[in-house]
Amino acid sequence: MAGGEKRRGLSKSCALLIVIAGIERYAFKGVASNLVTYLTDVVKMSNSRAATTVNTWSGFTFMLPLFSAPFADSYWDRFFTILASSSLYFVGLVGLTFTAFAGSRSTTKTISLYFLYTSLSLVALGLGVLNPSLQAFGADQLDYDLDHDNDHEPSSENKEVKSNRKTQFFQWWYFGVCAGSLLGVTVMAYIQDTFGWVIGFAIPTASMLLLIFLFLCGCGVYVYADPDLKAKPFQRILEIIKERVCGRNKITLVNDHDLNAMELELQDQKPLCNCSNTEANTTTKSLPDDHKSCKTGFSGLETVKLLLRLLPIWTMLLMFAVIFQQPATFFTKQGMTMKRNIGPNFKIPPATLQSTITLSIILLMPFYDKILIPIAKKLTKNEKGISVKERMGIGMFLSIIAIVIAALVERKRLKISKMMKTTPNLDPVSILWLLPQYILLGISDIFTVVGMQEFFYSEVPVSMRTMGFALYTSVFGVGSFVSAALISIIETYTSSRGGKHNWFADDMSEARLDNYYWLLAFTSAISFLMYIVICKHFKSRSDDDDQCDTNC
């Protein structure tokens, strides 16, 4: 920057992409947070089928980045990937709005399940490609800022400045996502309950159109990766596997220092620029063929190792994702049976309680940054206060406490319902009793979800950044499938013993969601203990960097 002036805040491109991410969350939460109510009340699905449908749809939505990321990292231009996927997202929302409109105009009040599933699939496909590409594109803007702003930094301060700016970016990104989620859950749930589903789905559709417009408005401020220098990590992986199988290329991995050097070489391979980088392009093209071949095989093997070593921690995070499926499904169904009146004329829409998760994040994030982290820095002598792995572990523990509280509240609700013999699906227990479990999930979100984003961002090569974000979202995708499978297995087993034993009975006075919550708490506790053991033996790349700095 001119005169060596150092910019403290985020660039215009980063800020614009954070706003765009917030709008996307507003549209998504406006549909997803109350979808189970739409499926049970309008489409007339059973509780278990509606929950399974929502979980399966969420699973596809969060799993698709795993399949799109290799193409986005190796072949697709991120700008046009974002534009195409957001357009597909918009078309899906248009279709969903049409299903609500057709249902409201039909004399039989029936909705075509085929058209409904097609619309939801288009939304899932668009979102599955959009989210990791948008985050990776934002990280590209951040890298450009760091590379240029830190040219004037002393080398001893460079690492700490970069670390703090990365943390700032992820926290502001998550703040934008939370703000959009909060508006989507509160405003849209009220509109859907009060004015109907046509308007309730039309507003998120209009929001996606606004997102596309704003994204195009930023063309002049974005920085782009040079397409001639775009790394193709997955192509290298396939090449090295082919060479290994055919026995045509024998590669020897030397030591950890060589691996670190190769990773630095990979990072320098993909500059970000506002124009073509002729010098860098010439340098890359002038590399000898033997060197290119060696680098291709070498980095391919190391990339496979980097991905496989993340698998144990990725697996242990799945039960956290299963717990996080509950607010949009069974927590909402719980709230529909409870006393929701505030005054004589207003009823709390059950889906709006999901906003307390987001409110908890927004209100407590400053406490986390300004009070908790400085205290932790003094106690641990760590520049971040607590490590990313510790941050994720704390959130996992809090999510277990939240689901235990949910089980206790549900058991109390059932007990009061049976004692007072109330009307089915209408209990005198206030819906506000559900607040503690929502708030605790919000606090756990601050620790685990932000920690997951930073963890997978930091542990993959820069040329596979979209894949890093895809690994983060895939935790929730597979977690959704696990949740759907659990519901199907439990319902099959419990319903075979008679209607009164069905944990997911449509009559909430007969359902045993408390038993389901206890099962989730038990399995999550086992997963948490295994996570602790795995983390003790896991050596992160940041640890390697710290050791390298010490040796130097």
Swiss-Prot record:
Bilayer topology: Multi-pass membrane protein
Induction: Down-regulated upon nematode infection.
InterPro entries: MFS_trans_sf (IPR036259), NRT1/PTR (IPR044739), POT_fam (IPR000109)
Ranges annotated as spanning the membrane: 16-36, 51-71, 82-102, 110-130, 169-189, 195-215, 311-331, 356-376, 390-410, 431-451, 470-490, 515-535
Principal subcellular localisation of the protein: membrane
A Pfam match: PTR2
Modified residues (Phosphothreonine): T81
Tissue: Expressed in shoots, roots, stems, leaves and flowers.
Record keywords: Membrane, Phosphoprotein, Transmembrane, Transmembrane helix, Transport
Gene3D superfamilies membership: MFS general substrate transporter like domains
Annotated family: Belongs to the major facilitator superfamily. Proton-dependent oligopeptide transporter (POT/PTR) (TC 2.A.17) family.
Entry protein name: Protein NRT1/ PTR FAMILY 5.8
Organism: Arabidopsis thaliana
Gene (name only): NPF5.8
